[in-house]
Amino acid sequence: MAELKKMRHNHYDVPVMDEPVIASQIKKTNQKKESFQLPQKKLNKISVFEKILCILLLCSIVGIVVITIQIRTTISETMNNITEAQVKNERKKEEMLKLEQEKSELSKADRIKSIGKKQGLSEIDGNLRKVK
């Protein structure tokens, strides 16, 4: 014959209810608890790891903002320096062209001959040299 299984008798602690609870009363009590909850109690619900993670996230965002601003200012300073260098370079080129033109005008053979004649010098072909 088959033996009967032993039944366990579990006793659950069930509170005795005097009056039935209405669902609207439960919602009101839940709302009251949340509305009177202090911010410090809300912060206590956040774990230490989450707090550290939030602080690190905020610090990294602030760091990225600061670094971005520094990079932008560095870029603008570099661009200004490049522009100044280009302007100086252009001025030097213009000055160089101007001086070369002046040199070529001053070193023309006709001009040298006319100045020599004014000074009372005579022209001897053997003593003339080309000016470069």
Curated annotation (Swiss-Prot):
Keywords noted in UniProt: Cell cycle, Cell division, Cell membrane, Membrane, Transmembrane, Transmembrane helix
Membrane topology summary: Single-pass type II membrane protein
Any GO BP: FtsZ-dependent cytokinesis
Keyword Protease assigned: no
Family matches, as InterPro entries: Cell_div_FtsL
UniProt-listed Pfam families: FtsL
Ranges of the Cytoplasmic topological domain: 1-50
Extracellular side: 72-132
Cellular component terms (Gene Ontology): cell division site; plasma membrane
TM annotation in the entry: 51-71
Family: Belongs to the FtsL family.
Protein's recorded name: Cell division protein FtsL
Organism, scientific name: Melissococcus plutonius (strain ATCC 35311 / DSM 29964 / CIP 104052 / LMG 20360 / NCIMB 702443)
Phylogenetic lineage: Bacteria, Bacillati, Bacillota, Bacilli, Lactobacillales
Gene: ftsL
